[in-house]
Amino acid sequence: MEAERLNAIESSLADLRRRAGELRGYLDYDVKSERLAEVNKQLEDPNVWNDSKNAQALGREKKSLESVVTTLTALDNDLRDAQDLFELAHEEGDEETLVATESDAAKLEARVADIEFRRMFSNPADPNNCFIDIQAGAGGTEACDWASMLLRQYLRYCERKGFKAEVLEESDGDVAGIKNATIKVSGEYAYGYLRTETGIHRLVRKSPFDSSGGRHTSFSSVFVYPEIDDSIEVEINPADLRIDTYRASGAGGQHINKTDSAVRITHMPTGIVVQCQNDRSQHRNRAEAMAMLKSRLFEAELRKRQAEQDKLESSKTDVGWGHQIRSYVLDQSRVKDLRTNVEMSNTKAVLDGDLDDFISASLKQGV
């Protein structure tokens, strides 16, 4: 075994241990470990459920604490195992064990980098699940087809990230594609990863719907907002709501269309409209739609406060959701993010959900 190779592995493992130690400090590992023990003790008390609100709050706190403590504990254990394996390979001159150590070090590097990346999630709602609203812009069939391509893109992205994605509502276009759709994304830091996707997405291509092969430009809007749990109070006056039921269309199978199971709720003071047709049960669709409305109202209030703050900071650029953020030019094989200038030439991969470079850059630059 060449000394240079051994030194490289040893140096890599030492660097990983150093970075893991920094993460323990930054994420308050010791404090969170102690607090987790306290919370577990409180939850073991049979009387804890006498106060259900407090018990639920403790349950949420436990989940949050465990996400840090469990992750860093497992990382430390695996780093220790990798170091032991390296020392064994070194002592015995075992090539196969050394190769295994190199593989372990590479996997640990990816894990440490992922935890470091998550330090950029500064929004209080970043750990939450989220909803993605996709709306076709003007342009008829071409715009509706573009909206359906974006729907597929985000479903594939969620699949890559290990998120659960559920299409709650989908309205078909008159000829092809979709007019609009809503996806619920469930997973750790779903909103944190996806929130910078809010904005206008522009497509330029030779249209398959134009027999002359002309070049067309289409727009679709994407709006991402966090799911809000029951611990956050959002007042909704029932008198402010108009609730309509209708027969579902699009995904859902034939049976779903036989009853008025789909639900549309309009919040009249703000004009916010939410729809859900995912379930055969009108009751469950109504509950999901109310959860969506609560999240939309909470997000609207946050954006209102942010807008007021931005007025005081004239150096800030417009971060309103209605601005163009990304351009997809298919015949030139170019997808460019207009905020970060990140560009990719593999348009097929991007449309298949390969958005990591764009999302990483937008989070690092704080767009």
Swiss-Prot record:
Organism: Burkholderia mallei (strain ATCC 23344)
Protein name: Peptide chain release factor 2
Metal-binding is among the record's keywords: no
CC terms in the record's Gene Ontology section: cytoplasm
Leader sequence segment: none
Miscellaneous information on this protein: The gene for this protein contains a UGA in-frame termination codon after Leu-27; a naturally occurring frameshift enables complete translation of RF-2. This provides a mechanism for the protein to regulate its own production.
MF annotations from Gene Ontology: translation release factor activity, codon specific
Chain positions with N5-methylglutamine modification: 254
InterPro entries: PCRF, Pep_chain_release_fac_I, Pep_chain_release_fac_I_sf, PrfB
Subcellular compartments: Cytoplasm
UniProt cross-references to Pfam families, sorted A to Z: PCRF, RF-1
GO annotation terms (biological process): viral translational frameshifting
Sequence intervals crossing the membrane: none
Post-translational modification: Methylated by PrmC. Methylation increases the termination efficiency of RF2.
Entry's family note: Belongs to the prokaryotic/mitochondrial release factor family.
Classification lineage: Bacteria, Pseudomonadati, Pseudomonadota, Betaproteobacteria, Burkholderiales
Chief location category: cytoplasm
Record function comment: Peptide chain release factor 2 directs the termination of translation in response to the peptide chain termination codons UGA and UAA.
UniProt KW keywords: Cytoplasm, Methylation, Protein biosynthesis
